[in-house]
């Protein structure tokens, strides 16, 4: 923390511009890499027209979106409608100011860390900024004056509420063993051993939570095409839609960088490169850090190509019935072992590693179970009974789960409601 607050003004501006350029280039390359990777996994060429082998496709798409006509639907709240994309973009870029790219280096004779700034509670600040970004989504859905965007915004709010709890609990174990919430101090604490080896359950929980936090497949319920057309940005076009898309990919980059910072040693070189004396000095750490970030981005692309979208009840059950309880148990175990370490227990490292592997194995095996809430029909079939007569037997093709009613039609009654009404 003593390295911050001493930079000259032009160096601070240069760092801010460098972060902005890094994020914009990462977004352009990530979109192209995702489309190319999806094409290869689906046995098709992918983008191959604009530029050499399609390398300029993302840039062409960005220019096209910026030059498109901006269509503004009627019946909207104009101020909120136009401000919502900005609210999503600004926190996404701001969070990267606390991510360390490398150690202290010399820039034109000035010694400065490769990080814009740091705080004693930097990780919590990043967590708060990610929560602020969802305001843009929910406000955009509400201001659009349409049903599908509103449902997408509400879903996004529920996702953030559900998965930020698990994400915050995954940070707790890191704070316990690093002794700090500062990103630079957490990286310094991983000088010898990365926390992915000591705190494996926290890493697994964070991986799942960060996918849910960024609304990416298989957790992209706020913009599910088959249910909500395009979700919260259905009524957006041109540059406003591009800003929502930019915020999504910048958020992906930010949570990937935070994962590398908390669990993979940040800018520290991996083994066996760390055996080289100069691997963690100078500008080389920027390369190691960027490679780790791209590893997590590749995971995002892979998940989108291979996993189907979860149902909404499965997604909520995964967060509240598995991730949060396991996080609480793991934090308790980690705190007990940390207390033993403070009291002079010599074998705290093997105890922590064994506990970490056991809890992570239980968590991964539990992920194979379908997280769904059985309805009355499923429960009746499991008991070997026929379900009670419902609206379907009366000729109405109404679903047996809560849905918005069609115009001029009443809400579908749950199974067995007709019997209860008859008894009453």
From Swiss-Prot:
Location(s), subcellular: Cell membrane
Key words, A-Z: Cell membrane, Membrane, NAD, Quinone, Translocase, Transmembrane, Transmembrane helix
Protein name: NADH-quinone oxidoreductase subunit H
Membrane topology annotation: Multi-pass membrane protein
Homology family: Belongs to the complex I subunit 1 family.
Assembly, per entry: NDH-1 is composed of 14 different subunits. Subunits NuoA, H, J, K, L, M, N constitute the membrane sector of the complex.
HAMAP family the record matches: NDH1_NuoH
Main location class: membrane
GO cellular component labels: plasma membrane
KW Transmembrane (keyword) present: yes
EC number: 7.1.1.-
Region described as Disordered: 376-424
Root EC class: translocase
GO molecular function, one term: quinone binding
Species per Swiss-Prot/TrEMBL record: Mycobacterium ulcerans (strain Agy99)
Transmembrane segments: 11-31, 79-99, 119-139, 160-180, 193-213, 255-275, 283-303, 317-337, 347-367
Chain's role: NDH-1 shuttles electrons from NADH, via FMN and iron-sulfur (Fe-S) centers, to quinones in the respiratory chain. The immediate electron acceptor for the enzyme in this species is believed to be menaquinone. Couples the redox reaction to proton translocation (for every two electrons transferred, four hydrogen ions are translocated across the cytoplasmic membrane), and thus conserves the redox energy in a proton gradient. This subunit may bind ubiquinone.
UniProt cross-references to InterPro entries, sorted A to Z: NADH_UbQ_OxRdtase_su1/FPO, NADH_UbQ_OxRdtase_su1_CS
Domain of life: Bacteria
GO biological process, one term: aerobic respiration
Catalytic activity field: a quinone + NADH + 5 H(+)(in) = a quinol + NAD(+) + 4 H(+)(out)
């Amino acid at each position: 923390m003593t390295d911050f607050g001493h930079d000259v003004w032009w160096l601070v501006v240069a760092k801010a511009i460098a972060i902005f350029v890094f994020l914009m280039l990462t977004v352009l390359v990530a979109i192209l890499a995702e489309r190319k990777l999806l094409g290869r996994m689906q046995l098709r060429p992918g983008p191959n027209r604009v530029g050499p082998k399609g390398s300029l496709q993302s840039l062409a798409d960005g220019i096209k979106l910026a030059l498109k006509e901006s269509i503004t639907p009627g019946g909207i709240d104009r101020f909120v409608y136009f401000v919502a994309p900005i609210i999503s973009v600004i926190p996404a870029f701001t969070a990267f100011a606390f991510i360390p790219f490398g150690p202290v280096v010399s820039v034109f004779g000035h010694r400065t860390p490769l990080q814009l700034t740091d705080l004693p509670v930097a990780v919590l600040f990043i967590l708060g900024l990610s929560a602020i970004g969802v305001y843009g989504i929910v406000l955009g859905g509400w201001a659009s004056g349409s049903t599908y965007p509103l449902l997408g915004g509400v879903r996004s709010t529920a996702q953030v509420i559900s998965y930020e709890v698990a994400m915050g609990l995954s940070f707790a174990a890191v704070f316990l063993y690093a002794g700090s919430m500062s990103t630079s101090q957490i990286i310094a604490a991983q000088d010898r051993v990365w926390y992915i080896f000591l705190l494996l359950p926290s890493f697994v929980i964070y991986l799942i939570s960060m996918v849910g936090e960024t609304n990416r497949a298989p957790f992209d319920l706020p913009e599910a095409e088959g249910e909500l057309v395009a979700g919260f940005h259905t009524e957006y076009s041109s540059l406003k839609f591009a800003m929502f898309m930019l915020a999504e990919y910048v958020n992906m980059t930010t949570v990937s960088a935070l994962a590398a910072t908390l669990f993979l040693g940040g800018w520290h070189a991996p083994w066996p490169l760390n055996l080289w004396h100069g691997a963690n000095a100078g500008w080389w750490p920027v390369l190691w850090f960027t490679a780790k970030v791209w590893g997590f981005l590749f995971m995002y692309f892979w998940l989108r190509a291979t996993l189907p979208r979860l149902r909404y009840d499965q997604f909520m059950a995964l967060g509240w019935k598995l991730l949060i309880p396991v996080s609480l148990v793991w934090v308790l175990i980690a705190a007990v072992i940390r207390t033993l370490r403070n009291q002079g227990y010599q074998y705290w490292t093997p105890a922590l590693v064994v506990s970490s592997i056991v809890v992570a194995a239980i968590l991964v095996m539990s992920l194979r179970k379908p997280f769904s809430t059985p309805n009355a029909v499923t429960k009746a079939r499991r008991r070997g009974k026929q379900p009670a007569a419902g609206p379907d037997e009366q000729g109405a093709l109404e679903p047996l789960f809560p849905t918005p009613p069609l115009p001029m039609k009443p809400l579908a009654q749950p199974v067995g409601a007709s019997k209860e009404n008859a008894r009453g």
